[in-house]
């Protein structure tokens, strides 16, 4: 079964994240709304798609996270900031979709930490990164990868250069 099939038929959760801090309902174009509309057109019921930004109180977050853990919400979209630390909805996560590249390698780890963690019912998960070749996206992903390598070398005291 393909991951796309799981969106339409299963109770597994897809998390879509980017570095945008807020959904702007007045904006002429919203990537979140565009993705939501395409998911609905593809057969995902609208009530199974949620934006983390709509959970703007602790009570609403608690309610949303409960729905996600029960499989009532199967597509959750939001920013790295809003879907980072403190979001424990890993129970049914099957896929993480990185819509953009953050500047800091730690933000990528934070995203990955939402899905690759103890308590997830899925033994196999998928992480998708969307990059347009020949654009700043490609350069940014390469830059973040190089930053991560540098940080790892410092943390492990393993340097590729002899001293």
PLM regions with names:
Residues 63-64, 90, 138-143:
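Short aromatic-enriched loop/helix-cap "lid" or pocket-rim segments at secondary-structure transitions
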Residues 103-109, 116-163:
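A conserved SF2-helicase RecA2
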